[in-house]
Amino acid sequence: MSTNENTKYFDLHTQGLGYLNRIQEVTPKEGTPFLSVTIAALRGSADNAQYTHFECRVSGKQAQELVRQLKQTVEGSSKVLVGFTLSDLYAETFTFKNGDKAGETGISLKARLLRIAWAKVDGQPFYTAQEDV
């Protein structure tokens, strides 16, 4: 006889739109390799937008497939804008090693990329997710 325990989770999801950058396969010394992307998310007024950068582990299957499809496009000169859903956002500190901020502490925002709702390449529609039925 087995006991079935229901584990409960608290989900913290962040939705927005931003540009894809630095797509790479990461192979840690210990652990499982994973796909990584940096999202430069837009915030503020449309005529003076600011950017917040999220370093993301691409977790959702649909997001993994789409990010891999867009890798060469992002590495080229094209701009890829996406509507995204992130989960498990947290901050991590680091020390700048070069440049004007060398020796100073910085903060990196990290999250899991769960889903891409839509994507545009240089302003042209590339992908739109189908709604869950």
Language-model segments: which ranges?
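Single-stranded nucleic acid-binding surfaces, predominantly the OB-fold ssDNA-binding core
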Residues: 1-133
